[in-house]
From Swiss-Prot:
This is S-adenosylmethionine synthase. Its EC number is 2.5.1.6. Binds 2 divalent ions per subunit. Binds 1 potassium ion per subunit. Pfam families: S-AdoMet_synt_C, S-AdoMet_synt_M, S-AdoMet_synt_N. Its cofactor is Mg(2+); K(+). Pathway: Amino-acid biosynthesis; S-adenosyl-L-methionine biosynthesis; S-adenosyl-L-methionine from L-methionine: step 1/1. L-methionine binds at E64, Q108, D251, K282. GO terms for cellular component: cytoplasm. Residues 108-118 are annotated as: Flexible loop. The keyword Magnesium applies. Catalyzes the formation of S-adenosylmethionine (AdoMet) from methionine and ATP. The overall synthetic reaction is composed of two sequential steps, AdoMet formation and the subsequent tripolyphosphate hydrolysis which occurs prior to release of AdoMet from the enzyme. It comes from Nitrobacter hamburgensis (strain DSM 10229 / NCIMB 13809 / X14). Belongs to the AdoMet synthase family. K(+) binds at E51.
């Protein structure tokens, strides 16, 4: 790998049209997991695959679900409006109160269910994966959260601005925004920022790019290591000159279109499957979380400075078809040894992953913006895949 190079990653805010859709889809997943226990429905039996489209004053939700009858269209619509309100959309072209919401959800296909539901009373085999696919996990020691620096700081910039907007400190900024950070690497380590891009919606129509920069620059500087921003750093703030029309009114959104923002900012491979709107029987989501968990614990254990981990599954088959680890020349143990010990340390069947990471819970809406990885595990079970509780187990097993 080259020692000196530039690498760029982007992030988008919760008000970006695609992220609005991710949020809505994940709110519906959470609704099923919240309502299930109240109705006596086993959380292991809940299924949700929800896709959302959002455009000018219109939201369309389609997909397949299984769960309590208490999850009515009226309840779903209420959750959707609350999510849009929380994001902050009260503009003429997209308002939480007046947007037209179409809900087109129907039961999960019986052909899919027969493979996924194998672990029901009387069955003689394990619960299978909800689909075929490949999933990647990645970790590196560039940041405290063991994430690549470019995506870590791109998220942090927008998260700080969002917090200020929600607190009322930045009332002139709208919900829709994007960031991009170009990081300079020397000897394979991040040492500075070459270019910064922030495009941010503003609620006063005639605000100039310079006026927007006055608002956002303090948060950019707060997010980045102080020594990384110098007089040689190039800034691009609202480079088109105007960003007044934002959100789904300015650009239609869809669930699952920001998979690189959701993961590692392009610093690691991606299997192609999106996360939002999917319950954890879908290995696109749960196995990607498991892969991150294992890669992070390998790095946290000091067994590698960088780790890429791939899992592969087939629909209706419980065990992963393959486990692959690449430590990019930084490993302190042979990669085939690491592959063996991670498979011994964690049950990587869909059911095993759900149990180990406690995924049958309403924890998904919080993942829908600012990345699924590099986050702090919370007391409600969110981001359990970011724990490093397996590090000592792996270290002892080598």
């Amino acid at each position: 790998m080259r020692g000196s190079y530039l690498f760029t990653s982007e992030s988008v805010s919760e008000g970006h049209p695609d992220k609005v859709c991710d949020r809505i889809s994940d709110e519906i997943v959470d609704l099923f997991f919240s309502e299930g226990p109240k109705a006596g429905v086993d959380p292991w039996a809940i299924r949700a695959a929800c896709e959302t489209l959002a455009t000018t004053n219109k939201v369309v939700i389609a997909g397949e679900t299984r769960g309590p009858e208490s999850v009515t269209k009226e309840k779903i619509e209420s959750v959707v409006r609350a999510a849009i309100k929380d994001i902050g959309y009260e503009q003429d072209g997209f308002h939480w109160k007046t947007a037209d919401i179409d809900i087109l959800l129907h039961p999960q296909s019986a052909d899919i269910a027969q493979g996924v539901d194998a672990l029901q009373p009387g069955a003689n085999k394990e619960e299978g994966a909800g689909d075929q696919g490949i999933m990647f996990g990645y970790a590196c020691n560039e940041t405290p959260d063991l994430m690549p620096a470019p995506i870590f700081y791109a998220h942090k910039i927008l998260r700080l601005i969002s917090e200020a907007r929600h607190s009322g400190k930045e009332k002139v900024l709208g919900p829709d925004s994007k960031s991009q950070v170009t990081v300079q690497y020397e000897n394979g380590k991040p040492v500075g920022v070459r270019e910064i891009v922030v495009s941010h919606q503003h609620l006063i129509e005639d605000m100039s790019s310079d006026q927007v920069r006055e608002r956002v620059e303090p948060y950019v500087r707060e997010a980045l290591p102080k020594a990384w921003v110098t007089d040689k750093t190039i800034w691009h703030i609202n480079p088109t000159g105007k960003f007044f029309i934002g959100g789904p009114d300015g650009d239609a959104g869809l669930t699952g279109r920001k998979i690189i923002v959701d993961t590692y900012g392009g610093a690691a491979p991606h299997g192609g499957g999106a996360f939002s709107g999917k319950d954890p029987t879908k290995v696109d989501r749960s196995a990607a979380y498991a892969a991150r968990y294992l890669a992070k614990n390998i790095v946290a254990a000091g067994l590698a400075d960088r780790c890429t981990l791939q899992l592969a599954y087939a629909i209706g088959v419980a065990r992963p078809l393959s486990i692959y680890i690449d430590t990019h020349g930084t490993g302190k143990a042979p990669e085939d040894t690491l592959e063996r010990i991670v498979s011994e340390a964690m049950d990587l069947t869909p059911r095993g992953i759900r149990k180990h990471l406690d995924l049958n819970r309403p924890i998904y809406a919080r993942t829908s913006s600012y990345g699924h990885f590099g986050r702090t595990p919370d007391n409600e079970g969110g981001f359990s895949w970011e724990k490093t509780d397996l590090a000592e187990v792996l270290k002892r097993a080598v």
